[in-house]
């Protein structure tokens, strides 16, 4: 019974991939196609009711190149509607800033807890760039995209969890993705291990679709990170 109660508690928090309280997070990533590393530092706070906010800062580094600033971002979400103890509807949004300009996104999450050890979140998201880029016709336009994401959350034990996360992107205007088409996929496999009430390390394997130029190969990425909860 104690193990079942633990799984129920973990299911509720894994549904949004967070634990309640303030935390700091550090993550390092390596893209095998571009030979690029990314360093991320994040601070955030998650309330017991499921609302949260986080601030993110990243830097990138490529071989024979200097460390460059990636982006700054602030994101927040709120569980607006919960008609049953299994179903949650949660809007969210973010704004970001990088060297070429700013942008943002709005999204709507629908989470359903099927069992104490499995829940699914479906996310509909619109990504917008405030700056213009040159499209396929040689004209300036916003390279916006529509995104559909799924988070398949599995509670393996009271400490170990796994998330399968496929995302589909479609470019709204006349732009191609790095695979040479108007749409692409990004698939993430996340493995988490809860050491204690403070430490939550994780490991991610990602496929970011094929890059047709300049790398002409599959974009695979490895991420290693950890969260510390206060």
Swiss-Prot record:
Q: Where in the cell is it found?
A: Cell outer membrane
Note whether Signal occurs among the keywords.
Answer: yes
Pull one GO CC term from this UniProt entry.
pore complex
What InterPro entries does the database record attribute to this sequence? Bact_OM_Channel_sf, Oligogalacturonate-sp_porin
Q: What membrane topology was assigned to this protein in its record?
A: Multi-pass membrane protein
Can you supply a Gene Ontology BP term from the record?
oligosaccharide transport
Q: Name one GO molecular function term.
A: porin activity
- Signal peptide positions on this chain: 1-20
Matches recorded under Pfam families: KdgM (PF06178)
Identify the keywords attached in UniProt to this record, alphabetized: Cell outer membrane, Ion transport, Membrane, Porin, Signal, Sugar transport, Transmembrane, Transmembrane beta strand, Transport
| Family classification | Belongs to the oligogalacturonate-specific porin KdgM (TC 1.B.35) family. OmpL subfamily.
Chain's role: Outer membrane channel protein that allows an efficient diffusion of low-molecular-weight solutes such as small sugars and tetraglycine. However, the specific substrate recognized by the OmpL channel is unknown.
Mind telling me what this protein is named? Porin OmpL
Organism in which the protein naturally occurs: Salmonella typhimurium (strain LT2 / SGSC1412 / ATCC 700720)
